[in-house]
Amino acid sequence: LVNHTFRGTEGFSDGSAPADVGSRFEYYWEIYYMADGRLEAHYQRPASRVPHGPIEALGFVEFGKWRINDDGDVCQSIPSVGYGVELCYWVDRRGDRMAMYYTSCGAFNRCYVGRLGPEGEIVRGRAFTR
């Protein structure tokens, strides 16, 4: 992952719904993994521009941390995602495609160990599209 950008989509609160279900909401994310253990995350999620305003899909940019734990899982924390609690994943990489499966869920109540999390493409370098 070092010096690569992982980008794709993940379901929000209804993330376990199949892709063809009308209620499914997917949000985009792009994460660049730096060699020093920092990450830069560009992502979208439902939010309001003003207190008590309408909810819409808004874009965010944050910096967090990542590491490889003793089990070989990728663990990361992003301050405003899951209250900044570290999440860990088992990674399945096939060419330029990658899928991450939860091995620890932190503060996510829609998560369970083994559930598919982020899935998408991996690109060399800092390669944000949004």
Predicted regions mapped to residue ranges:
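Lipid interaction determinants
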Residues: 1-65, 69-130
